[in-house]
């Protein structure tokens, strides 16, 4: 007989896997899919925390039917209104017209806009409580992690924190729902960084504030139940919490990301010389990304991870190579902080790339290393020394 996964005797995992979609938010590649997590608590009153993408509502409702056996859903707590979590709300209300919807003021503004629902609402603020029998929920507002209406929900008897998108990750779940069953833990944490960089990274100060509020409440947490990815158990959650503490505080590892575009291989040769110079100077973590081939989400993951960033571009139509410009914009809008930066370029007849790359450090309020250099055509011997020296300068600054 099919068994719906359980976190405790009365708390069920009713999320679904999406292995069909190629890009999360129609932007970020998800080769291993993604999970849309929702949770059902059964007590004197039944309470659902979030829903799933409407494309998977049939699977979601089937799970609810198996558990409820004809009982209604009494409450829906909305931690996050984004359609991958709130997409089935309208259908859910049609099924359970007497269901009370729990959220904050901003939740209800969005609920009206996305679903036209304006009745049967139960508004909560930080510190408010809702009892459904032996279970009691309290609420903690977490605005801009990563939408303005986001809130966390804490269930006291089982010590569960339902954390919306915080502590989530890309990747569908393969049978097990708990982090204790992860067979490739570091790979999963790498995916968490990629998810954070792409989806939440712009809002680091708000993440940091939400983490501080969790600590201020003194919550005793046994399980953390995010909207994507595994459910964290107490011991394993230290990994996820530590990762979020570091990322939201702009803490980085000693290492360098080299981003380059190259039409005919000349700029790529310069990137390789820089990497070799860094290695010779003792830098252990060096990542080179050809921006026309590397996945942008993987590039962002590495930019969030390492302190050093070197960008190289050929001149193209008197401007930057457009894939480089696109990546710079992704970095710009995430307001990545506290990096050590260097630049280099190439051209055939009219130099332009380097003078457009140099101001990026000042714009982002980063520390710039060196003046950079620029290769004309394929005259590699004329700049090989400058490339090597720039790598050495970057290494020295990282180790200072």
What are these regions (language model features)?
Residues 44, 55-102:
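Active-site metal-binding motif and surrounding structural segment of the metallo-beta-lactamase
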Residues 88, 294-299:
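Short acidic active-site motifs
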Residues 226-253:
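Terminal amphipathic helices with adjacent charged low-complexity linkers/tails
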């Amino acid at each position: 007989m099919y068994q719906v996964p359980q976190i405790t005797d009365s708390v069920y995992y009713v999320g679904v896997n999406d292995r069909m979609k190629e890009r999360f938010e129609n932007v970020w590649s998800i080769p291993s899919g993604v999970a849309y997590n929702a949770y059902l608590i059964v007590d004197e009153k039944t309470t659902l925390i979030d829903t799933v993408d409407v494309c998977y509502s049939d699977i979601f409702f089937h799970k609810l039917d198996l558990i409820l056996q004809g009982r209604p859903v009494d409450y829906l707590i909305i931690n996050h209104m984004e359609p991958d979590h709130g997409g089935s709300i309208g259908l859910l209300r049609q099924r359970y017209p007497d269901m009370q919807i729990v959220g904050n003021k901003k939740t209800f503004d969005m609920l009206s806009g996305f679903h036209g629902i304006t009745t049967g609402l139960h508004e909560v603020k930080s510190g408010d409580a809702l009892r459904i029998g032996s279970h009691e929920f309290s609420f903690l507002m977490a605005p801009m992690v990563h939408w303005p209406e986001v809130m966390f929900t804490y269930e006291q008897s089982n010590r569960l924190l339902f954390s919306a998108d915080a502590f989530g990750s890309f990747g569908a779940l393969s049978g097990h729902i708990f982090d204790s069953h992860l067979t490739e833990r570091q790979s999963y944490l790498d995916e968490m960084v990629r998810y954070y960089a792409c989806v939440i990274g712009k809002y680091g100060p708000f993440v940091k504030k939400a983490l501080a509020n969790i600590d201020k409440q003194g919550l005793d947490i046994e399980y953390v139940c995010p909207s994507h990815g595994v459910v964290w158990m107490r011991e394993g959650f230290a990994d996820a919490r530590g990762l979020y503490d570091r990322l939201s505080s702009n803490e980085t590892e000693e290492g360098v990301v080299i981003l380059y575009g190259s039409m005919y291989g000349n700029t790529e040769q310069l990137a390789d010389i820089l990497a070799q110079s860094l290695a010779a100077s003792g830098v252990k973590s060096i990542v080179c990304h050809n921006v026309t081939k590397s996945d942008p989400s993987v590039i962002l993951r590495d930019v969030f991870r390492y302190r050093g960033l070197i960008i190289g571009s050929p001149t193209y139509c008197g401007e930057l190579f457009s894939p480089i410009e696109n990546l710079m914009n992704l970095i710009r809008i995430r307001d990545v902080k506290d990096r050590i930066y260097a630049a280099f370029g190439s051209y055939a007849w009219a130099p332009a790339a380097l003078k457009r790359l140099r101001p990026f450090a000042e714009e982002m309020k980063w520390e710039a290393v060196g003046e950079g250099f620029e290769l004309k055509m394929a005259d590699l011997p004329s700049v090989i020394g400058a490339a090597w020296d720039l790598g050495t300068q970057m290494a020295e600054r990282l180790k200072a």
